Amino acid sequence: MTISNTRDITPELIEAHGLKPDEYQRILDLIGREPTFTELGIFSAMWNEHCSYKSSKKWLRTLPTTGPRVIQGPGENAGVVDIGDGDCVVFKMESHNHPSYIEPYQGAATGVGGILRDVFTMGARPVAAMNALRFGEPDHPKTRHLVSGVVSGVGGYGNAFGVPTVGGEVNFDKRYNGNILVNAFAAGLAKHDGIFLSEAKGVGLPVVYLGAKTGRDGVGGATMASAEFDESIEEKRPTVQVGDPFTEKCLLEACLELMASGAVIAIQDMGAAGLTCSAVEMGAKGDLGIELILDHVPVREENMTAYEMMLSESQERMLMVLKPEKEAEAQAIFRKWGLDFAIVGKTTDDLRFRVIHQGEEVANLPIKDLGDEAPEYDRPWMEPGKHAPLPASNVPQVEDYSTALLKLIGSPDLSSRRWVYEQYDTLIQGNSLQVPGGDAGVIRVEGHDTKALAFSSDVTPRYCEADPFEGGKQAVAECWRNITATGAEPLASTDNLNFGNPEKPEIMGQLVKAIEGIGEACRALDFPIVSGNVSLYNETNGQAILPTPTIAGVGLIPDWTQTAKIGGMQDGDTLVLLGGDGTHLGQSIYLRDLFDRADGPAPTVDLALEKRNGEFVRSAIRNGQVTACHDLSDGGLAIAVAEMAIKSGKGAELDAGDGLPHAVLFGEDQARYVVAATAEMAKLIALNAEGAGVPFRVLGTVGGDSLKIGNVVDVSVADLTDAFEGWFPGFMSGEPVSDN
């Protein structure tokens, strides 16, 4: 057959496909001729950042990805971790940033759909979801619209699909004005012997298309996700996919039923770059070629070209290599669920990716060079600058700490996210033990009497901007700490690395140092990275986002009756600070929100201290010594105890300590927790802390209806609650954004 070429391949067309001149020359050298238009689209999709990780691959290899519980690390649709009794948890986090800015509802909804597919493609039934959302400053004209659309999209898809949203984050910063971030996490449960991978095995086997029909939605989506935005952003709306959670629910049930039948050899969901990426990955991983016949692809639009079919990112679709003798059984299962089932090709032994449309060969390419041997860059990078030290004595104090506390707890970044999570179904499936609003979400493991899992997602972007290395460490440490604060043992993590343009050495430097920090923390805390995603080119008109390496993690609770949450304080309990008093105000919320300053270094993360203090806290929780626990992060001690008071509906009378009041109250030193315990248990905790070398201070007693800290803070729990709960609903109702 001759290869037809439907369009002239011009320099403008090459540039429009996101390919650099040297990359196009590499294509010419590789195939010895000019590519067809369809082939150009295939190379564009497979060689962009979104699919190939060409700028980050070198550095991602340095991350720790193995451990005694790790069954499957990076490289598959999701990571797999052993939780005992033949069970495993399957999880991943992934970005849907660019589509969510252009079309917030569908962008966020299909982000949720995509991550759920990644999990059930592995053979796991999804049991939990989270989402980490970053928006522009509240008074930016688009922020309210984007928040509303994204939250509705996340809830609309997750609720209809039937998975509980158990946690997440919402932040606001002007650096996200032109590029919001939507990072979606999902976890599922499977049996050890029920894990399915994407590596095709065997020659001449049928390649089967499953799920919804193919349309033109999302054509070029992966390429768009690898580019900066500019003034033409609205023109990119057609590249956003449209999701249908009910079809996805049917796809889940059909896939799990088919997997149980023993028919599946390999399976890959169609995400970024659709049919192209899924077929190439399956073949390249198995050292096989793939031949596709596009005339057999189920379509929902007329006159679709080969280019459009290969690059469509229509949702709720899978590609599978099937045992031939199981074909009729497989078809019957998918027909029963009202889904398309079509044999669209076969595996071959020639390592070629061949695409046939209307009797013509429109693509014939070396499959390994598209897949696991795609280009890889060692981009130049600059060491990020360091901030000068900032002693607390050089940071101004406020006249009224009660007013300061009310302002901070009612601020955009620290106020309650109830407005967000009440739009999500947090209880569906009936296993949720701790819902959003605490340190981590907790769910029971179905079919097990006592076992539970904890989930958290964390990063502090302003720390990463000030010091990407310490910021990367801190993201891991805080995720580990939040999981620990429930009494769970952190098992493993997934990363979602959101950065600007890697072609700028200063941005590449942020990425390199953040990965270095993440790796160091994961090694020290035995918290390996088992899956992840990189999202680069998050810039608009040259303005990059804050570096945002989101870390999500999973922890195991052997007995869910021995857990802690932030709202468990009882009258008469003693509060104990574990980890020492605050001294560090550099890059703090106190400095930023009260004085509009972003100076000083990010707090240093002492990983040995993190591990020692965290293991001590976990032991106390599991031994039944603790009635409530909260880790310290943004806003320090004052915010932590205020949140505990609000969630418990109880006041407390606490000692202010001996340090500078603003540092003790609002310092953001790491590796710290506040625990509540009965008076007797608090004595035991203090005694044990002394023996373990864990710094501690007995803060005071729970009771009354006000939070009193020495003679510097005296605020009623009712006023704290009003401030905490009031900001978000007020903002979304259209009230002017105030500084309180």
Swiss-Prot record:
Keyword Cytoplasm: yes
Catalysed transformations (reactions): N(2)-formyl-N(1)-(5-phospho-beta-D-ribosyl)glycinamide + L-glutamine + ATP + H2O = 2-formamido-N(1)-(5-O-phospho-beta-D-ribosyl)acetamidine + L-glutamate + ADP + phosphate + H(+)
Disulfide links within the chain: none
Residues given in the record as ATP binding sites: 53, 92, 495, 532
Binding of Mg(2+) 2, residues: 118, 269
Amino acids binding Mg(2+) 1: 94, 533
Residues in the signal sequence: none
Subcellular location(s) per record: Cytoplasm
One GO cellular component term: cytoplasm
Pathway(s) annotated for this protein in UniProt: Purine metabolism; IMP biosynthesis via de novo pathway; 5-amino-1-(5-phospho-D-ribosyl)imidazole from N(2)-formyl-N(1)-(5-phospho-D-ribosyl)glycinamide: step 1/2
EC number: 6.3.5.3
Residues involved in substrate binding: 95-98, 117, 241, 313-315, 535
Keyword Ligase included in the entry's annotation: yes
Family matches, as CDD domains: PurL_repeat1 (cd02203), PurL_repeat2 (cd02204)
GO MF annotations, alphabetized: ATP binding; magnesium ion binding; phosphoribosylformylglycinamidine synthase activity
Pfam family, one: AIRS_C
List of catalytic residues: 50, 96 (proton acceptor)
Keywords: ATP-binding, Cytoplasm, Ligase, Magnesium, Metal-binding, Nucleotide-binding, Purine biosynthesis
BP term (GO), one: 'de novo' IMP biosynthetic process
Coarse class of the protein's main subcellular location: cytoplasm
Subunit record text: Monomer. Part of the FGAM synthase complex composed of 1 PurL, 1 PurQ and 2 PurS subunits.
Family membership noted in the UniProt record: Belongs to the FGAMS family.
Function statement: Part of the phosphoribosylformylglycinamidine synthase complex involved in the purines biosynthetic pathway. Catalyzes the ATP-dependent conversion of formylglycinamide ribonucleotide (FGAR) and glutamine to yield formylglycinamidine ribonucleotide (FGAM) and glutamate. The FGAM synthase complex is composed of three subunits. PurQ produces an ammonia molecule by converting glutamine to glutamate. PurL transfers the ammonia molecule to FGAR to form FGAM in an ATP-dependent manner.
Protein name as it appears in the record: Phosphoribosylformylglycinamidine synthase subunit PurL
Species: Brucella anthropi (strain ATCC 49188 / DSM 6882 / CCUG 24695 / JCM 21032 / LMG 3331 / NBRC 15819 / NCTC 12168 / Alc 37) (Ochrobactrum anthropi)
Top-level taxonomy: Bacteria, Pseudomonadati, Pseudomonadota, Alphaproteobacteria, Hyphomicrobiales
